[in-house]
Amino acid sequence: MTKPALRSDIPMKPTAHKQEKPSVAFAHLGCEKNRVDTEHMLGLLTEAGYSVSSDENDAAVVVVNTCSFIQDAREESVRTLIGLAEQGKELIIAGCLAQHFQEELLESIPEAKAIVGTGDYQHIVDVLKRVEAGERVNRVSAFPTFVGDETLPRQRTTDQAVAYLKVAEGCDYRCAFCIIPKLRGDQRSRPVESIVAEAHQLAEQGVQELILISQITTNYGLDLYGKPKFAELLQALGEVDIPWVRVHYAYPTGLTPEVLAAYREVPNVLRYLDLPLQHSHPDVLRAMNRPWQTDVNERLLDRIREQLPDAVLRTTLIVGFPGETEDHFNHLAAFIERQRFDHVGVFTFSPEDGTAAADLPNRVDPSIAAARKDRLMALQQPISAERNQRWVGRTIDVLIEQHNPETGAMIGRCDRFAPEVDGEVLVLPSEKGLQASPGTMVPVFITGSDVYDLTGQLVDTNAMAVTAQTSQ
């Protein structure tokens, strides 16, 4: 891993003392866990009376919530910072890059008036006040311990109908390739009651899809209760008036019989399993410090399909890990072809200083790793197309997220598609010309499919909120 290439040629300028609160904008980068932190900072600043703009051009100060998971993410964060600095913006750098490279950022970017660590975003109002007073602030805890809850102000940035709910922060596992525990600390779970209370708040705001996130969601509760309580959490969320509860980041060993039973029994918990398996070959999994015993992933998938035969399965994989041979890769390719996942994401290995994998020998040439990624995705595409094609001719529920009043076309998602990472459903008006508004869940008859997306037509019914098609 290389440190981000930062700029040091811009002269330092003093921070002027301001009588009025400055306008503030946010630039969000990285994962949805980072998004929740951004939303809390937005809520805190709004509550404190700051003018929060959605346009960086209108703001005097820009809070950049950064990502530092892999080299590409760091480079994107640095490009964003430099671009804003060149516009003359004062910067508050938050998130994983701030946690990772705090001194380098302050030394190299004069416009950086403050840095805020991953466990310190709750202090954003105090940090901004100190910046207004002319201070340059380093608010980064060496060992993050904070986790936000339902009492912390929050201003959502997602579509009205979709919300992310962080059930825990940090991670107790030490996968060889992952820097996250060093950036976000050990696992800190929220109490069940706290999570359910926030879910009720979100339901009152009209949320139709609640997405549970943490680093290892299925490990929820182990630190707090002495044993995982994810099954109990899912059961409790079954009492919340939100039609879809989706789970991201399900670590394989956490999918116990009790958890699978909750998926099966709780009506609003979607049978959508996001499984970061990373690889299939025991040698590679062992080097990754992942569950590696022979056929461990095969047995897990067999158990899932036995308990949840209609489950939608997504996985993420890493190719080019140090020591991965052609035989190892072929094992992975055969695994993908045999298991026939609905959705697959593939990443090439990114060496990170401070992780065990950074010092491993037998690095795979980046061009070979990239070619393996392309081969794996080419193998998966016809599988994904076949999995989608099964839905043609069926009527399914679709959550509408976009609507073009000129054409009548709508875009939404069904329960087999998670936001951002999976496909979409293109929805045409019903035979009577009816259209559905964003934020509504409506029946759609599926008429077509491709590798990633579905196409369908709104079903005429008196039970849904619709708007009449406007004549042109």
Curated annotation (Swiss-Prot):
Binding residues annotated for [4Fe-4S] cluster 1, in chain numbering: 31, 67, 96
Cited SMART domains: Elp3 (SM00729)
Superkingdom of origin organism: Bacteria
Substrates-to-products reaction catalysed: L-aspartate(89)-[ribosomal protein uS12]-hydrogen + (sulfur carrier)-SH + AH2 + 2 S-adenosyl-L-methionine = 3-methylsulfanyl-L-aspartate(89)-[ribosomal protein uS12]-hydrogen + (sulfur carrier)-H + 5'-deoxyadenosine + L-methionine + A + S-adenosyl-L-homocysteine + 2 H(+)
Pfam families noted in UniProt: Radical_SAM, TRAM_2, UPF0004
Cross-referenced SUPFAM superfamilies: Radical SAM enzymes
Gene Ontology CC, one term: cytosol
Every MTTase N-terminal domain range: 22-133
Enzyme Commission designation: 2.8.4.4
Transmembrane segments: none
Repressor as UniProt keyword: no
InterPro entries recorded: Elp3/MiaA/NifB-like_rSAM, Methylthiotransferase, Methylthiotransferase_CS, Methylthiotransferase_N, Methylthiotransferase_N_sf, NA-bd_OB-fold, Ribosomal_uS12_MeSTrfase_RimO, rSAM
Function: Catalyzes the methylthiolation of an aspartic acid residue of ribosomal protein uS12.
Family: Belongs to the methylthiotransferase family. RimO subfamily.
Protein name per the record: Ribosomal protein uS12 methylthiotransferase RimO
Organism: Prochlorococcus marinus (strain MIT 9303)
Lineage: Bacteria, Bacillati, Cyanobacteriota, Cyanophyceae, Synechococcales
